[in-house]
Amino acid sequence: MENLISSKTEENNTILKIENVVIENISIPGSAGIRTATVKTSFKHIISVSLTPYITYGQQVDSAQSIHDDNKYIIANKSLRFYCNGDQTVNVCIIGIV
């Protein structure tokens, strides 16, 4: 079982692989506007994509994010574009099959 589980970190990407299932978490800091997350894993099928924002302590503005790309785009281009309305760090979590 030990040989079936691996993990690694590349730049802002943390990747956990269990057999052919991969969870890739990408931390994207930045300002308001469209951001791009670079995906390191060559997914064959994406099961889930989620965004989690982290705001600065004391921030008064609501945080909102919207994903621009569908799963086919993410697989083909190994990137994900999303919009943020503020200056928060966003974690992108992609779960899929390789």
Predicted segments, located by residue:
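Extracellular attachment/recognition segments
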Residues: 15-98
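A signal for long, low-complexity, Ser/Thr/Asn-enriched, surface-exposed stalk/shaft
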Residues: 1-7, 11
